[in-house]
Amino acid sequence: MHRYRSHTCGALRESDIDSNVRLSGWCHRIRDHGGLLFIDLRDHYGITQCVVDPDSKAFRLAETLRSEWVVKFDGRVRRRPDGTDNPELPTGAVEVFINEIEVLGEAAELPMPVFGDQEYPEEIRLKYRFLDLRRDRLHQNIMTRGKIIDSMRARMKEVGFFEFQTPILTASSPEGARDFLVPSRIHPGKFYALPQAPQQYKQLLMMSGFDRYFQIAPCFRDEDPRADRLPGEFYQLDLEMSFVTQEDVFAAMEPVITGVFEDFADGKPVTKNWPRIPFAEALRKYGTDKPDLRNPLIMQDVSEHFRGSGFKVFARMLEQEGNEVWAIPGPAGGSRAFCDRMNSWAQGEGQPGLGYIMWREGGEGAGPLANNIGPERTAAIRDQLGLKEGDAAFFVAGDPQKFWKFAGLARTKLGEELNLIDKDRFELAWIVDFPMYEYNEDEKKVDFSHNPFSMPQGGLEALQTQDPLTIKAFQYDIACNGYEIASGGIRNHKPAAMVKAFEIAGYGEETVIERFGGMYRAFQYGAPPHGGMAAGVDRIVMLLCGTNNLREISLFPMNQRAEDLLMGAPSDVTTQQLRELHIRLNLPQN
């Protein structure tokens, strides 16, 4: 028999009754039932109930066992007594009668129990992550993560992609987020950077004659903490294709992502033919470029009903060019209490309030706005939004560029409060036609809106002749249930167009050569049309595991202060290490 086990703790069945077995694992739970000791033994594969009676030579040692001790049991498999089966366990029809015990590893007093689903402070969970990872929910999430990545790899290879590994030590790129810098010992005063993404390398692969590349790529960004992003590092399914249009990328990747979701959706419906929503339409209808399409609410422009109306606040606003009034329908939200609650919520979000109209019995509009604009305009709004008695509408007004984010939050809040969001499905969509440029209010200049390497729609001619703020890019995202899970684009592969694109954003050719010299050089030697995308592995896993916390699907995450509480990172280093790197510390004064 094997030194440690003949079976795993998830393997024994009724067919094993009367077999002599050896199991090893952790003492998950210990119960004393009238002299009989019941020990649930756990390993990676499952749990087996083991029993020791007072007449067993192993009983005295069994009494000393504590939770999370690592032990080896020798015993005999028997049928559980009638009425004691546990249908929730694959091993629930049998138990092991122990006749010999060996303690393989004792455990100190636990700072948090492994048994059960009780919540514990994040600091404790991260400091003792090795215990947290033994808990079933987190353990299963990590296993699901591995299986999802396996599915991604298999599906990518099925459609002709090859996996390559791009460098981890690379050159710093000042645009975008801050780099994590790595000092060079051999080249004093110079630094490598950890890649924010393999963007330039994957484009260089296409220029090197490869056709379809992918990798599960680690990416590093020294960003301030955000609720929807882990500090430090994240992983993406990164890919690039040569000689493709935007349609080719969609045709290749939509089945891959759909298939991965279907593999792990646990029977929940997954969108088959993804809608394509232009960026501008997404903002107007949903107030976000990553809409949750499970929420049926669609915003509409109702400016015409307030222009010249008795509600002077909106009427005066609409006298200024560019201002609009948007309505968010609230089906079954037509009670004073609910409308007042939404108004209070808006004030809590830093807004002056949230105007509303309620439609009561007989279809009459009610509320301050209805009283000011009159029944005819109120009825016209109701008809435009397709509402009825018992419903409500909520209004935001002003410059859409300034209020669309809040409008999107209000739409989401209404969907949640009115229980309109079907949590048991995955709604995927392409968001297309992103603007190439936006106006940077802080720096008072035109800047890139998204990826600076994207091809402008209309190519070089558009860059030379159009108002930059009207140029759209061959840039696209994938949205799922309110999250951006992928982003990509067709690349600007012509040197003249690349230089012009950066020139519009205020960067001269010398800056392009300085920052992106390797790729710019490669463009001079025959660059194929190419494009691709990167899908966020962590967010996809998070959605499929049914959680909204990225730490619940990551092995050893940092806390929100970018600290690894288990390993003690970041840490001090020795004077000798700093001397070898020619670095002297100049720390801020407290």
Curated annotation (Swiss-Prot):
PROSITE patterns: AA_TRNA_LIGASE_II (PS50862)
InterPro entries (alphabetical): Aa-tRNA-synt_II, aa-tRNA-synth_II, aa-tRNA-synth_II/BPL/LPL, Asp-tRNA-ligase_1, Asp-tRNA-ligase_1_N, Asp/Asn-tRNA-synth_IIb, AspRS_core, GAD-like_sf
Protein's cellular compartments: Cytoplasm
Entry binding sites for ATP: 221-223, 484, 536-539
A molecular function (GO) term: ATP binding
One annotated GO biological process: aspartyl-tRNA aminoacylation
Keyword Cytoplasm: yes
Keyword Aminoacyl-tRNA synthetase annotated: yes
Region Aspartate: start-end pairs: 199-202
EC number: 6.1.1.23
GO cellular component: cytoplasm
Gene3D superfamilies according to UniProt: Bira Bifunctional Protein, Domain 2, GAD-like domain, Nucleic acid-binding proteins
Residues flagged as site, Important for tRNA non-discrimination: 33, 83
SUPFAM superfamilies registered for this protein in UniProt: Class II aaRS and biotin synthetases (SSF55681), GAD domain-like (SSF55261), Nucleic acid-binding proteins (SSF50249)
Residues passing through the membrane, by range: none
Keywords: Aminoacyl-tRNA synthetase, ATP-binding, Cytoplasm, Ligase, Nucleotide-binding, Protein biosynthesis
Main location, first listed in the record: cytoplasm
Reactions it catalyzes: tRNA(Asx) + L-aspartate + ATP = L-aspartyl-tRNA(Asx) + AMP + diphosphate
Binding site for L-aspartate: 175, 221, 450, 491
Source organism superkingdom: Bacteria
Record's function text: Aspartyl-tRNA synthetase with relaxed tRNA specificity since it is able to aspartylate not only its cognate tRNA(Asp) but also tRNA(Asn). Reaction proceeds in two steps: L-aspartate is first activated by ATP to form Asp-AMP and then transferred to the acceptor end of tRNA(Asp/Asn).
Family from the record: Belongs to the class-II aminoacyl-tRNA synthetase family. Type 1 subfamily.
Name of the protein in question: Aspartate--tRNA(Asp/Asn) ligase
Organism for this UniProt entry: Afipia carboxidovorans (strain ATCC 49405 / DSM 1227 / KCTC 32145 / OM5) (Oligotropha carboxidovorans)
Gene: aspS
